[in-house]
Regions:
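Beta-sheet-rich non-transmembrane sensory/scaffold domains
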Residues: 1-218
Length: 218
C-alpha cells in the first residue's frame, strides 16, 4: 500500500515502510519496520493490510484466541509507525483465498465474520461473539477487556430455506475514531443464517454479502 511517499509492505507478520523519495530523489530506502505480532511463537495468521489517511490496519486470525485480530497503527511524516490498538472479534477462521474480510470506509472498519453453529451443544449456554481490546499478554492467552457483545440469538435473521450446514454470517461496522487508551469498539452488527460459501463486497455506500450452500453438502 502507498501512503504519500511511503510504501507499506506486510510480510510474515511484519510491516516494512519504504521511502520512495529519499532526500527528494528517486530511490528506495527503509524508513522503519515493526512486528505486528507480539511474540514470534504467536499462533496468528496475518493476511490483510488496509490504509486510510495516516492509519494502517492489519487483519489476521488468532487461533489461540479463536478470533479475528485487528491491529491499528499510525504512520507519521518520517515514516515511523506507532501501534494504536489491537482488537479481537469472536469468529471462526474467515480466510478465503478468493475473497477478503475487512475494509476501511469513511473512517469505519467494516468486517465480515463467520460463526459455525452446525455442532452447537444445546445443553450448554451459547457464547455469542464479542469484540475485545488487547491489554497485555498473559502466560498462554492475551489479557483483554471483557468486551462488548456484537449480537445474540434474538438479533439473527433466520434462513429463508432449509440449511444443512448453518453458518451465522455477520457484518460489523465499527467507527475507529481516535481510539483513546481503553476505548472499546462500538460496532453495529447484522447477522443471519445461511450456507457455508459466501462472497463479500463493500462500496463507499453499501455492503453486499451473498451466501450459498456448499455444493458438496447437496
Amino acid at each position: 500500500k502507498q501512503i504519500v511517499r511511503y510504501l507499506v509492505v506486510l510480510q510474515d507478520g511484519r510491516l516494512f515502510v519504504v521511502n520512495t523519495r529519499p532526500g527528494d530523489d528517486a530511490g528506495l530506502t527503509l524508513a522503519s519496520r515493526t512486528n505486528v505480532y507480539r511474540s514470534p511463537g504467536q499462533d496468528t495468521w496475518y493476511d490483510e493490510l488496509l490504509t486510510s489517511g495516516n492509519r494502517i490496519l492489519v487483519a489476521g486470525y488468532s487461533y489461540a484466541e479463536q478470533a479475528s485480530e485487528i491491529t491499528v497503527l499510525t504512520i507519521n511524516d518520517a515514516g515511523q509507525l506507532q501501534r494504536e490498538a489491537t482488537y479481537y472479534i469472536s469468529s471462526n477462521d474467515y480466510y478465503d483465498i478468493e475473497n477478503y474480510a475487512t475494509r476501511l470506509v469513511n473512517g469505519n472498519l467494516v468486517i465480515y465474520t463467520p460463526l459455525d453453529v452446525s455442532n452447537v451443544n444445546p445443553r450448554r449456554a451459547m457464547r455469542w461473539p464479542v469484540v475485545r481490546r488487547w491489554l497485555r499478554d498473559g502466560d498462554r492467552r492475551a489479557v483483554t477487556t471483557e468486551g462488548r457483545s456484537l449480537f445474540d440469538g434474538n438479533d439473527i435473521y433466520r434462513p429463508v430455506q432449509r440449511t444443512l450446514e448453518p453458518i451465522v454470517h455477520s457484518v460489523s461496522v465499527c467507527p475507529l475514531g481516535d481510539l483513546s487508551a481503553g476505548d472499546e469498539l462500538e460496532c453495529r452488527t447484522t447477522a443471519f443464517v445461511g450456507g457455508e460459501d459466501r462472497e463479500f463486497f463493500v462500496s463507499t455506500t453499501d455492503i453486499f454479502l451473498w451466501v450459498t450452500p456448499n455444493p458438496y453438502d447437496a
